[in-house]
Amino acid sequence: MEPQLILGSSSPRRKSILQYFRIPFTCISPSFEERSVPYQGDPAAYSQELAVGKAESIVQDHNPEGVILTADTVVIYKGKVFNKPSSRDEAIEMLKTLSGQTHSIITSVALLQQKKLMVGQETTQVTFNQLPEKYLGRYVEAFSTLDKCGGYSTQEGGGLIIHNIQGCAYNVQGLPIRTLYHLLLEFDINLWDYLV
């Protein structure tokens, strides 16, 4: 019997990563309001709370039978969380701050089925090139970065801004495959069985 997997996300990047496998899944956007959760200084706990909140909102709104998969990614630099920018100007300021620096990306992945909840995390270090300020507005507009935490994308023009990535590149895109693989095993779903 095929597993019922529900991707609780509107992220095209997470959907694309999951489509690397033949595992059937449906998408439901969570109603959880991320900005309702205040950041209290622990980025790992914050990311986990958001991922779990998204999964619980899907249960509350839809009560599906399958395994719900949600994730939350945060960018951290010098103790500050960089969420999705709310404006072009905020995205540009984020890029200026991260220019030439190394920051952390934490993604929490939550799987929830009925009362069974499993959560995992991945942390990756990303170092930016020195960014020419006069082009940052163009970058934000060209790659529609307002829906991406930290105001940037590794897939679209990432080579212009990223010097190197230490750790899981899929984590930077919002869904670390290694973490997902281990969590799915707890629900008797093996990604090796779903290779394309």
Curated annotation (Swiss-Prot):
Subcellular location: Cytoplasm
SUPFAM superfamilies per UniProt: ITPase-like
Superkingdom field: Bacteria
GO biological process: nucleotide metabolic process
Sites annotated Important for substrate specificity: R13, T73, Q155
Cofactor entry: a divalent metal cation
Enzyme class: hydrolase
UniProt cross-references to Pfam families, sorted A to Z: Maf (PF02545)
Gene Ontology CC annotations of this record: cytoplasm
Molecular functions (GO terms): dTTP diphosphatase activity; UTP diphosphatase activity
Residues the record marks as active site: D72 (proton acceptor)
Role this protein plays: Nucleoside triphosphate pyrophosphatase that hydrolyzes dTTP and UTP. May have a dual role in cell division arrest and in preventing the incorporation of modified nucleotides into cellular nucleic acids.
Family named by the database record: Belongs to the Maf family. YhdE subfamily.
UniProt protein name: dTTP/UTP pyrophosphatase
Organism of derivation: Chlamydia caviae (strain ATCC VR-813 / DSM 19441 / 03DC25 / GPIC)
